[in-house]
Amino acid sequence: MALCARAALLLGVLQVLALLGAAQDPTDAQGSASGNHSVLTSNINITENTNQTMSVVSNQTSEMQSTAKPSVLPKTTTLITVKPATIVKISTPGVLPHVTPTASKSTPNASASPNSTHTSASMTTPAHSSLLTTVTVSATTHPTKGKGSKFDAGSFVGGIVLTLGVLSILYIGCKMYYSRRGIRYRSIDEHDAII
């Protein structure tokens, strides 16, 4: 749930920054000064270190008709490390959008590793004809391949030598202890003797 809130907050911050950038840049990508323009506000890719990738993409276009010089907002790409979540909800305040969720799970591609699985979910929210918000969440799992068990002869011989060394030190130590202690004979009392 916290991931959903962070994704929505990040999307809102990027939209505000994109609108501020539009107010400062006097020309658009074609260099024209007026007319109808589509504006791309943000493109967010969220990548996790555990080989699971989540992508949240928001393509928001709006129509501008004015005599002032409109500008195209810069395409922004941000990489953030997050924990994976299964549900993403984004709501537009003041507008009740029609939501069309789709989900797909595909088998591994030829370009992907043979054991990877790619799962994606997409949600399109058309609120007005000039506003389109798309949220895509996809997770790719790449299983880690272990090196496997490999016999190392050096470690085997080293372990045997180490064990024999420790045993020999213990044996020599015990021999020295008993030799220094000396032999203690006990005299047999007459009541201990068996006659």
Swiss-Prot record:
GO cellular component: membrane
Keyword Phosphoprotein: yes
Record keywords, A-Z: Glycoprotein, Membrane, Phosphoprotein, Receptor, Signal, Transmembrane, Transmembrane helix
Keyword NADP among UniProt keywords: no
Compositionally biased tracts (Polar residues): 101-126
Transmembrane segments: 153-173
Protein topology in the membrane: Single-pass type I membrane protein
InterPro entries reported for this sequence: CD164_MGC24
Modified positions (Phosphoserine) in chain numbering: 187
Family per similarity comment: Belongs to the CD164 family.
Function comment: Implicated in oncotic cell death, characterized by cell swelling, organelle swelling, vacuolization and increased membrane permeability.
Name of this protein: Porimin
Organism: Mus musculus
